[in-house]
């Protein structure tokens, strides 16, 4: 492609809301242009990157035995009413009606239409397993769309849905899709981690997220430095301490005056207590109106997902109000503790491991020291209710846990019959009986992975793409292209030769100043820069720069061809 035949729309102007590097660089490089809040035009260079990602996704899905189809983007309300999602989805579901006043929505996801298609066309186990996918534009009416295409209202997603007779067949395809997603991200060239994830309202036992590692990631993921264990912070756990090794303390409980100390931070800073000897007692109320005291070590944080999954808790829970707490304890938050606690205690393993702990005295301005489990507090339950922290022992006891930020670009689930059962998507099984098909679903954020790639790899000058998805593999940057016949001749011939070799190349024939050409090339992120000028041509040389390493070399064209091949 010649630069004069496409639209290179680089700019220095940025809107105030562009806070992420990926958002800033996509706008500055002219990859996208904002049309409305959370809605973007894909400019030629941006679309080229997007199409390269789509091609990799499509190639790997096809290799995995999936078949592509295309579902409508506008969905009738009747389908979502079958699964009760017409009302449950909330304001993110963009609803509309046609001239006949029939209700429709812009598809935020496509479980219902794929099941509707399947129930009309799949009748027997002999047609299974079947894995179908699409690459489709979706719309979710986010209240505050932000971060550019990272969290846009309109986005492009690959969503696949598999159909099965039994759980083992579903698990086999799930494992195939897990490997396929790894292949996709490997082929793109991103650093990532598959992590065990919460299934949420969908339920089931199996769910994994695919997280691209990046400082700007909204998700926190943990992984072992000694094994392949990895999980989202919501689900991550740790090796439980051996409570049988606790030392029986001979120290007696002491009540101390702690005026105006209502936080753990003040307790260990002003009273010089070891924070790992302190505990936090927080009161919650579950959906059944039952109150519980949740106890964790002073330097730990509660994990909402784990708590809602406890058998004792009727989810969802809420934090008790100050008034509710005072009516139970006759004390305020910040002074609560486990000694003579009037409600059921659920304590984290790490809190249970402490001897001679420090806690509130259930009396304002007082704390107890030297409190011990089993000796002083006997009525309690133990559960994993906290977020893991760096240094925790991995649950497989291989290495310790480390935390990092990630951007979720893929999520796979075993849906089982969550959608097929209410929509009566049944087949005749091998036993001759009718039963709901089992399903898996596999989402991949095509437009999101583009932003994630930028977040993972960039510098102060612009984007450093993985070469597999760079808008152009090579940029020829001729100095005085429209003034020097020799420069034009060499640049044009090299351009044609590279095209003939199947190399994706851009010839910057705009006649722009060298500084403008070089700045645009760095900003847009072409993988290889070839500078052609009269001075070097006199020596039979051109200048080559690798965008990723910034290494520059003065080499011959023959040497350049070897590098590019």
Swiss-Prot record:
Key words of the record: Aminoacyl-tRNA synthetase, ATP-binding, Cytoplasm, Ligase, Nucleotide-binding, Protein biosynthesis
GO cellular component, one term: cytosol
EC annotation from Swiss-Prot or TrEMBL: 6.1.1.15
Coiled-coil ranges from the UniProt annotation: none
Subcellular location(s) of the protein: Cytoplasm
Reactions mediated catalytically: tRNA(Pro) + L-proline + ATP = L-prolyl-tRNA(Pro) + AMP + diphosphate
UniProt keyword Nucleotide-binding, yes or no: yes
Domain of life: Bacteria
GO molecular-function terms, A-Z: aminoacyl-tRNA deacylase activity; ATP binding; proline-tRNA ligase activity
Predominant place of localization: cytoplasm
UniProt key word Glycosyltransferase: no
Pfam name, any one: HGTP_anticodon
A GO biological process held by the record: prolyl-tRNA aminoacylation
Domain comment (free text): Consists of three domains: the N-terminal catalytic domain, the editing domain and the C-terminal anticodon-binding domain.
Family: Belongs to the class-II aminoacyl-tRNA synthetase family. ProS type 1 subfamily.
Quaternary structure note: Homodimer.
Function (record text): Catalyzes the attachment of proline to tRNA(Pro) in a two-step reaction: proline is first activated by ATP to form Pro-AMP and then transferred to the acceptor end of tRNA(Pro). As ProRS can inadvertently accommodate and process non-cognate amino acids such as alanine and cysteine, to avoid such errors it has two additional distinct editing activities against alanine. One activity is designated as 'pretransfer' editing and involves the tRNA(Pro)-independent hydrolysis of activated Ala-AMP.
Protein name stated in the entry: Proline--tRNA ligase
Organism of derivation: Francisella tularensis subsp. mediasiatica (strain FSC147)
